[in-house]
Amino acid sequence: RCTCARTILAAVLPMTTTSSADWRTRLINATEEMRALLRRSRRIAVLGIKPETRADQPAYFVPAYTMEAGFEVIPVPVYYPDVTTILGQPVYRRLVDVPGEIDIVNVFRRPEHVPPHVDDILAKRPRAVWMQLGIRNDDAAERLARAGIEVVQDRCLKVELMRMGL
């Protein structure tokens, strides 16, 4: 049998080495799985966070609550180029620029705007990506899961933390 095609595919698609059955286990839906993920996480980068001037918006008050719950929040805003700190923390413009490891990337982007961030997420290699309530992009989720990253979609981190008593 010729293995040329397999070799070429492995070179072209290095992030898709996980079998179909395996990557689906990284799509987290169950409360117990979310609880386990949150219990073993401390550092959460918030992609699409908004500054204090937008305190009435979920992209600000959810990360603020997350910080109050004891997590380290790392702001990664998409807009607001003049803002240098949010929630008292230095701002990073790309996930790959954040020093150290990231446990969870909490995403506040419209579903159609998630795919352009996937390469940055993959370069940083967080343990998990959490897409907020109303945010679901199955193609991005599959790509992340195939790379070994756990994915939560369409769930509010604040609501889940409150519901779980964490």
Q: What are these regions, as identified by a protein language model?
A:
Residues 2-4:
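Cysteine-centered motifs
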Residues 6-8, 160:
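Extracellular/secretory pathway and lumenal proteins
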Residues 16-166:
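Structural/interface elements that position substrates and couple domains in central-metabolism enzymes
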